[in-house]
């Protein structure tokens, strides 16, 4: 199973959760589970093998939140064995990383 973690941080405000949803949807991911502190999205089937379909989980870590920063742990994963470093899951991870960077609200570090 390929797993690629990201750590995103943002200034906590009312739009944080919606901003996380917007970032994931901008990567053509479909939101399949959404709670106050957890979001799961998946790649829409589009001609790629089932094992390569990517799931993205985002956990908003409110326990360590400060007035200035809140952490969101993001994991991009699929069932594909990562035989090559440039695989489908890693490309989706790169896309998610770039989407977070493009949003002025977020700061991202690779996990």
Residue ranges and their predicted role:
Residues 1-111:
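Ser/Thr-rich, low-complexity intrinsically disordered terminal regions
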